[in-house]
Amino acid sequence: IPNGLDISRAAPLLCAGITTYSPLRTWNVGPGTRVGVIGLGGLGHMAVKLAVGLGANVTILSRSKNKETDALELGAHRLLDTSDTEAMQHALNGFDVILDTVPVRHDINPYIPLLDIDGTLVVVGQLGLLEEQFTVPMIMGRRRIAGSMIGGIAETQEMLNFCARQNILPDCEMIRMDQINEAFERLERSDVRYRFVIDMSTL
């Protein structure tokens, strides 16, 4: 871990950080790339910070308009309300890469037409079956659905060095060992911004 990175906040970089950094690098995200991020949780908030750090134009895609303040505070340039039919229509062909960080089964069909020609939607959050896919938008726009997991040791080190240079760290809440059960209950309520870190000195 590079000097200058807060150890307590660096821990989630080895999971959420590399999980989102790897696809951003694989799909050549850089200055001017139009990136959408579905989901604003542990993975999503890191995707925003890293994509902004790489120079991308970043939009959070969410059904919850009330997440807009959080999205902007994390560095996103805007929030697209995916429940707004007119807003979704205006966003067609508007993204080069979309990172889907949602961890539960959901319909990704509405997001495919948001990709520009040769655009890619990368699934990093959901393990399991996808909903049935309507293939016309993929065929007509040469759009792709891909998946990505974590990176190797070299890419993880690259990510850590990048975060140290850009001063990028996850938003964390430190908890004691005796708070673990409470933390699990809060996770079930989505009551965490955005990662818990256990203080092992409290063992």
Write out the residue ranges for each language-model feature.
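C-terminal hydrophobic helical "lid"/dimerization subdomain
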Residues: 153-203
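Residues in the short beta-alpha loop(s) of Rossmann-like NAD(P)-binding domains
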Residues: 64, 127, 151
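Adenosine-nucleotide cofactor-binding segment
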Residues: 31-40, 52-110
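Helix-to-beta-strand junctions that scaffold the AdoMet/dcAdoMet cofactor pocket
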Residues: 115-116
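N-terminal Rossmann-fold NAD(P) dinucleotide-binding loop
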Residues: 44-45
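NAD(P)H dinucleotide-binding glycine-rich loop of Rossmann-like/cofactor-binding domains
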Residues: 1-38
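Short glycine-/small-residue-rich Rossmann-like dinucleotide-binding loops
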Residues: 102-103, 125-126, 202
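Rossmann-fold dehydrogenase core element
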Residues: 120-122, 133-173
